[in-house]
Regions:
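Conserved AdoMet/S-adenosylmethionine-binding subsite of the radical SAM
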Residues: 1-13, 19-167
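C-terminal accessory regions of radical SAM enzymes
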Residues: 157-210
């Protein structure tokens, strides 16, 4: 993979993701990071990991020293329920942040777990409270064994409309679907009737703005 990236100058950003890259020991992880960081056209490294939420003791001072050496590095984690935001999890995120690495969150919309307005609002506000920015809310993919967790898109859109009223802009994620093939992540925007009416009311302003 390192060889492929080194021969593909169009690649400016490399993501280390699932499985979970933090399941490597420190030496192995640094070997991987240093290999990609040594490629001149790779400008940004990203890590995707559930570890801060489920194994926060893995975020050690030594690990953070390693991560700090490879900035600009962005860290995306995944909290799916407010109960996961424990004191240990918050401290783990804070250690990463103190190393100068931004921490964002990518949740998955899960039926019976976080698909109620109260649960989702508590999750998003809780993340903002520990300086973790809610970045994406993924519509649950049709993966094997996950069917019972899937909602329909309409449920997700209604949920986004409700939590928009109880969260600040910094706490609102993008609701996206990761489409198969090369389309990638597609934003799903809730346009409730009140919003549609408001847009129609001010249509002349937008149409004639210079």
């Amino acid at each position: 993979m390192v060889r492929h990236v080194s021969k593909t100058p169009q690649i400016r950003e490399v993501i280390l993701s699932g499985g979970d890259p933090l399941m490597f020991d420190d030496a192995s992880l640094e070997l991987i990071l240093s290999a990609f960081a040594s490629i001149p056209h790779v400008e940004v490294l990203r890590i995707g990991s559930r570890v801060p939420a489920v194994l926060p003791m893995r975020i050690t001072p030594n690990l953070c020293r390693i991560l700090k050496r490879y900035r600009p590095l962005w860290f995306n984690t995944q909290f799916n329920h407010p109960a996961e935001i424990t004191g240990d999890a918050a401290r783990a995120c804070n250690r990463i942040q103190e190393a100068g690495i931004p921490v964002s969150n990518q949740s998955v919309l899960l039926k019976g777990v976080n698909d109620s307005p109260d649960a989702m609002q508590d999750l998003l506000n809780g993340l903002q409270k520990i300086s973790v920015r809610p970045y994406y809310l993924f519509h649950c993919e049709p993966a094997l064994g996950c069917g019972h967790f899937r909602t329909d898109v309409r449920t997700g859109l209604k949920l986004m409309e409700k939590i928009r009223q109880g969260c600040s802009g910094l706490a609102l994620p993008q609701y996206v679907a990761d489409l198969p093939g090369q389309e990638g992540k597609v934003p799903l925007w809730p346009l409730s009737r009140p919003i549609q009416n408001a847009l129609r009311k001010h249509q002349d302003f937008f149409d004639n703005f210079e």
